[in-house]
């Protein structure tokens, strides 16, 4: 089944590992053990999008790769042309919460004939040692929660997906963007 990804000029941003179904920017990604320990440290390195050693903007993206914010991969399969930037925040709830940078993905040329296998997503890959505190693979494995800020040019339902590459398992959870051009904090 084909789906519409948007019009030229629309901006699409999603959290780690999710497929883009909306538009906007995102920052402040964090995954912590779901026991919700006060002040638990995020398991995501550069979730605040502060580090962009490759540069702060790349235009005319049509292939997968690491373009701006370190550790965040942009994956694409026949889905138009994109620009990715590391944005500086100066206002809004995410800025007020202490975030000064975000990753932004802008659809500059839409693909008018998407097929079922076409996609655009932003992914973050953990290394095994990064997840040791979750006791993955044991009877005492801990649950996790993913919290992030998102700002979109369109409202609607989006999907965050976690994929276990070692065991070829995945879990998806939806979240809703309620207001356009407004930073919203989501926990899934």
Label for each model-derived stretch:
Residues 1-39:
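Intrinsic low-complexity, repeat-rich intrinsically disordered segments enriched
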């Amino acid at each position: 089944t084909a789906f519409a990804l948007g019009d030229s000029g629309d901006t699409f941003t999603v959290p780690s590992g999710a497929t883009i179904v909306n538009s906007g920017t995102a920052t402040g990604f964090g995954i912590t053990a779901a026991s919700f320990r006060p002040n638990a440290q995020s398991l995501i390195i550069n979730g605040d999008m502060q580090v962009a050693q490759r540069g702060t903007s790349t235009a005319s993206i049509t292939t997968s790769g690491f373009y701006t914010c370190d550790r965040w991969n942009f994956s694409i399969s026949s889905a138009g042309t994109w620009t990715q930037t590391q944005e500086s925040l100066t206002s809004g709830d995410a800025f007020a919460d202490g975030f000064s940078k975000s990753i932004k993905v802008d659809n500059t040329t839409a693909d008018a004939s998407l097929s079922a296998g076409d996609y655009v997503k932003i992914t973050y890959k953990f290394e095994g040692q990064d997840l040791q505190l979750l006791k993955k693979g044991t009877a005492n494995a801990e649950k996790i929660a993913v919290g992030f800020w998102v700002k979109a040019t369109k409202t609607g339902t989006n999907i965050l997906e976690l994929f276990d590459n070692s065991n070829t398992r995945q879990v998806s959870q939806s979240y809703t963007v309620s207001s356009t051009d407004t930073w919203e904090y989501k926990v899934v």
